[in-house]
Amino acid sequence: MSNVSIKLLREGAKLPVRGSAFAAGYDLYACLDGDKELIIPPHATAMLPTGLSFALPEGTFGAVVARSGLASKQGLRPANCLGVIDSDYRGECFVALHNDSNEERTVRHGDRVAQLVLLPFLPMEFEQVNTLPETVRGEGGFGSTGR
């Protein structure tokens, strides 16, 4: 098991926690000043502080993804669908939470608002070429493999 250094930036910030021993995601909690709550209007986005900053291992990034129950039951999900925390970023982690529902949603201090999944990535350089290798699929686009 690897260790990730986390700095608590706000009073009341909570460390990420897995929901089960085999869960891939670690719950991220809203850290609102003074136990406040935040109302997110229908079809609007709010920036929620977590009160955390990370030193993620080199060669990884943090993927901020939706919590399945929050998205399916309340219509709340990360606005960018998948947020990226780069391993060299040291600022506070915020969750841009979007309300897809037609009703106001309330987020309270300590609510679980997203999950953090640590993933590896492959550093690469792009090489411009005049031709690409042929494949069976070729240039078949949207829906071309579905029947």
Enumerate the predicted regions with their spans.
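DUTPase catalytic domain/fold
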Residues: 1-147
